[in-house]
């Protein structure tokens, strides 16, 4: 079976971290001594041809978190690139499934069962064609809404009662498949780059304050 290699930019750490960063990294190592209590699942398709596509919003959010915190996320486990991190004061398994979008649930279900993590502690960041470009929507449960990645996660968790952070990519003017695997324009990417931190903030808020608080703060 083909085992994908992690993208090279995810395997490298920034040079010369500051003293404050070193202290924070030590704290994060201490926090990571226990098993993860949450999954943060960032959806996308692996491969360079998908890097700037609408379906890869989740991967973009993960990469933003990796870059901001000087992290690694290159351990291939549960058919996903993974790393246990401190996020929202909890031990969280960051996941970038490498199954392709439509089989994302295989990776998520396997990790959730292994760590005995309940569905309401599985947070998924994904694209949403029903939302205008750059608009966020936090939901605590619900149908897949035509998103095959979410549909597969629902099937493998056996429930739709898991929180998700949806990032709008706009409605297609043509075939949906071509739209979601199509690249952002330069102007669209600027909008998306501006919303990734908010998507991560919404996910963190779910952990610290609950879904309702995240909805009140980030939906709109």
Predicted segments, located by residue:
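Short alpha-helix boundary/capping segments
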Residues: 16-22
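Nucleotide and nucleotide-moiety/phosphate-recognizing core
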Residues: 23-140, 150-155, 159-165, 172-175, ...
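Short glycine-enriched, charge-decorated loop/helix-capping segments at active-site entrances
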Residues: 137-143, 181-185
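Active-site-proximal loop->helix
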Residues: 176-180
């Amino acid at each position: 079976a083909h085992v994908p290699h992690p993208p090279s930019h995810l395997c490298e750490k920034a040079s010369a971290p500051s003293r404050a960063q070193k202290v924070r990294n030590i704290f994060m190592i201490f926090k990571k001594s226990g098993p993860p209590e949450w999954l943060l699942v960032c959806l996308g398709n692996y491969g360079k041809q998908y890097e700037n596509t609408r379906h890869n919003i989740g991967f973009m959010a993960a990469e933003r978190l990796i870059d901001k915190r000087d992290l690694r996320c290159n351990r291939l486990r549960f058919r996903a690139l993974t790393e246990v991190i401190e996020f929202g004061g909890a031990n969280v398994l960051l996941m970038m499934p490498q199954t392709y979008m439509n089989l994302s649930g295989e990776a998520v279900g396997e990790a959730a069962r292994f760590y005995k993590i309940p569905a309401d502690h599985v947070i998924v960041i994904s694209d949403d064609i029903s939302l205008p470009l750059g608009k966020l929507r936090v939901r605590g449960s619900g149908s897949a809404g035509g998103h095959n990645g979410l549909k597969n996660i629902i099937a493998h968790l056996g429930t739709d009662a898991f929180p998700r952070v949806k990032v709008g990519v706009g409605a297609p003017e043509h075939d949906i498949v071509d739209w979601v695997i199509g690249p952002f324009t330069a102007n669209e990417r600027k909008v998306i780059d501006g919303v990734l931190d908010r998507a991560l903030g919404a996910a963190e808020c779910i952990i610290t304050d609950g879904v309702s608080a995240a909805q009140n703060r980030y939906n709109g």
